[in-house]
Amino acid sequence: MKNFWKISVFFCVCSCLGPWVSATLKRRARFPANSISNGGSELCPKIRIGQDDLPGFDLISQFQIEKAASRRTIQRVVGSTALQVAYKLGSNVDFRIPTRHLYPSGLPEEYSFLTTFRMTGSTLEKHWNIWQIQDSAGREQVGVKINGQTKSVAFSYKGLDGSLQTAAFLNLPSLFDSRWHKLMIGVERTSATLFIDCIRIESLPIKPRGQIDADGFAVLGKLVDNPQVSVPFELQWMLIHCDPLRPRRETCHELPIRITTSQTTDERGPPGEQGPPGPPGPPGVPGIDGIDGDRGPKGPPGPPGPPGDPGKPGAPGKPGTPGADGLTGPDGSPGSVGPRGQKGEPGVPGSRGFPGRGIPGPPGPPGTTGLPGELGRVGPIGDPGKRGPPGPPGPPGPSGTIGFHDGDPLCPNSCPPGRSGYPGLPGMRGHKGAKGEIGEPGRQGHKGEEGDQGELGEVGAQGPPGPQGLRGITGIVGDKGEKGARGFDGEPGPQGIPGAAGDQGQRGPPGETGPKGDRGIQGSRGIPGSPGPKGDTGLPGVDGRDGIPGMPGTKGEAGKPGPPGDVGLQGLPGVPGIPGAKGVAGEKGNTGAPGKPGQLGSSGKPGQQGPPGEVGPRGPRGLPGSRGPVGPEGSPGIPGKLGSVGSPGLPGLPGPPGLPGMKGDRGVFGEPGPKGEQGASGEEGEAGARGDLGDMGQPGPKGSVGNPGEPGLRGPEGIRGLPGVEGPRGPPGPRGMQGEQGATGLPGIQGPPGRAPTDQHIKQVCMRVVQEHFVEMAASLKRPDTGASGLPGRPGPPGPPGPPGENGFPGQMGIRGLPGIKGPPGALGLRGPKGDLGEKGERGPPGRGPKGLPGAIGLPGDPGPASYGKNGRDGEQGPPGVAGIPGVPGPPGPPGPPGFCEPASCTLQSGQRAFSKGPDK
């Protein structure tokens, strides 16, 4: 089967929490605020002071007071005139915003503070901050204080030395009369000037100011003595403007007319004749965002729409849950030799394979010593062989390992009996005896000479993660996320084009001309007049801001199935299936003639190594055999250290495999062996389960509503994605039928001897084996016909070998002992004769292999039924229309009544919403 790179590195997606602001009630309800940072190093641009296009920052928008009113957290009230709206801030509300979201680089050196407000009740006698910036410890850095006890206003600021400086404006009784007032402070480099109701009160010198700490909060309406307590007052307008001279140009037309006792009024005369049309008025300002409408009823299912354009590739989805096992794919041709893998852990022993039988071939290169296999079943008693001559004394055997004893940490209570010790070193080779008759399989004999190459060792466990693979195929577009919370206002943008003129007001009836009266005493300021006739088309207005995204509509009913799409590209290979159950072994047939090479069979699991047979005499060297069919992929060899990549040599003719050699002692854990050959890809697996819902994305820009489309043509295949996370390792399946014998691969580079395991590692391995096989060993100890073996003693010095005795009866199978320490790799044995070609096995059931790569993106699904959501907010203002043809000038009329226009609200603010002195009702 085809091998895939495995990767075990997970990519974590950190979702960033957006900035937060709060307006907390006594139950601590929070209101988010909008950031006004322009992203630069300073809050205000360095351009000529005195222009109305300098940016300003509406604190009512920043503190989300309008949204709080729509939630009925605070109350909307009538403002200074019937055309104005104000907000009544009670003592149960706490408006505060992190300073870093408003002024990340601090306040500018020069600016102005403007507000229209009214105090009532007990607030007239309190000492409180209408606006204040605190540091992280709650200490004041900048603020405007109103003192009802001393009838004064104070501007506080942080000096260069960090101390709090104050400029106090005294004797202001007219401010504390429960009426609407407009308070403005122009902060310049060396002075602070107070304006009340557009009248300049006083200018006081101030010292150089220090930089504020942006880690604190900006608050509204707090007591000076207890900054945690809010003060009730009514707020219509509050603005921070980059022009310190803005208060000098402000008007107070929105304030009610004040009639004093020192003024007299005359009767108002009749209206004059209609005056001529006035000059074009200034461009109107965008209106405030409307309140979200209620969700509409669920609409009926819509008809299937036309095919839509192919969607853009979606972001990679989260790793899905492991899919079901797929069917075993067809066997592929052998791949090129891959790079040497990392060191693997010992794998689960495989079942024993069927012995092969082939034409004897030339001796192969010496093979590495295999890992010790389990004890095989005792065979029937063989015929007695001829007695050979006594051999010479063998050399002393190595000392055995110290056995466990009761009380040892590995077996604190009682140690299980150990297995028989490993055989000693081979003795000197005796004289060649007469050839005996072929006997039945006998019990295990003395350890013979170094055998031929043994069977492949156990499959190692998964190694460490390999290098990062290629980028994965783009995942399917995820479901639409829920509506996110409204973010902060964006940064101030460039100055937009002027807006279109407002709607024409109703023309008033012309009045009759009255008799000219005597000149009277100058009257008080008149009330605003009716709007004049429509002027010429003004310049285009500023584009309005995007509205808040509407609530998602209810899920519609499923639409009708669309027409079948085009045939897609071939899918990626699926997950290998689970191996099938072991078939019933057939009767042994007669040896047939060598057959033609068959088709490549599926790879079977490595079998358990059987007990070594008696070493027979070496036969004459046979002729080279014909090239056999490619066999199944072998198990990983003894790992060696990663060697340098050598130049590939010319492939030699593969020789037949040698006879299995005697199992050697278990060697130490070696370095990783070379990577096996790459197999063919498997069949496409079943679709995996749907992944978890992704994190909520940021709200996207408002788009136009399009017609639902039918599935489009399949797009090109995306970039290959990262390999998925490897699923949990399944249990070993039953042994499959033996595959055809494959050609022996080129011998790998001989690695250096492995490092000896540490004592701690040996104890861990022994403890794990004891825990896994303790039940089995305990059951074996209870057999009535077998006595429990004692603890292994220290081996004594070997005596001279005696003459071989008669073959005795086979003994019972011993208790499976603890695995020994892995011995050093043995020398490669001679290549044995090639076995007979076995019959091709039936196709096994689905195997279970590593998780395959994600499948290609499927075709777009059928469009869902149309549904009616909530009424959305008004769309953005369209582009200005083409100016019309100028009309014929009319005859001049008499002067009309005074018009009403609020210069502050008619001013264009770059990148900001309209800074009117209060939203219209």
UniProtKB/Swiss-Prot annotation:
Disulfide bonds join C44-C242, C198-C252. Residues 1-23 form the signal peptide. Residues 24-268 are annotated as: Nonhelical region (NC4). Residues 787-901 are annotated as: Triple-helical region (COL1). Residues 50-244 form the Laminin G-like domain. GO terms for molecular function: metal ion binding. Transmembrane segments: none annotated. GO terms for cellular component: collagen trimer; extracellular region. Residues 757-786 are annotated as: Nonhelical region (NC2). Residues 269-325, 326-356, 358-403, 416-472, 473-512, 604-656, 657-711, 712-755, 790-847 form the Collagen-like domain. Residues 418-756 are annotated as: Triple-helical region (COL2). Residues 269-405 are annotated as: Triple-helical region (COL3). Covalently linked to the telopeptides of type II collagen by lysine-derived cross-links. Prolines at the third position of the tripeptide repeating unit (G-X-Y) are hydroxylated in some or all of the chains. Zn(2+) binds at D213, D215, H253. Keywords: Collagen, Disulfide bond, Extracellular matrix, Hydroxylation, Metal-binding, Repeat, Secreted, Signal, Zinc. It is found in: Secreted, Extracellular space, Extracellular matrix. It comes from the Eukaryota. Residues 406-417 are annotated as: Nonhelical region (NC3). Each subunit is composed of three triple-helical domains interspersed with non-collagenous domains. The globular domain at the N-terminus of type IX collagen molecules represents the NC4 domain which may participate in electrostatic interactions with polyanionic glycosaminoglycans in cartilage. Heterotrimer of an alpha 1(IX), an alpha 2(IX) and an alpha 3(IX) chain. Belongs to the fibril-associated collagens with interrupted helices (FACIT) family. Structural component of hyaline cartilage and vitreous of the eye. This is Collagen alpha-1(IX) chain.
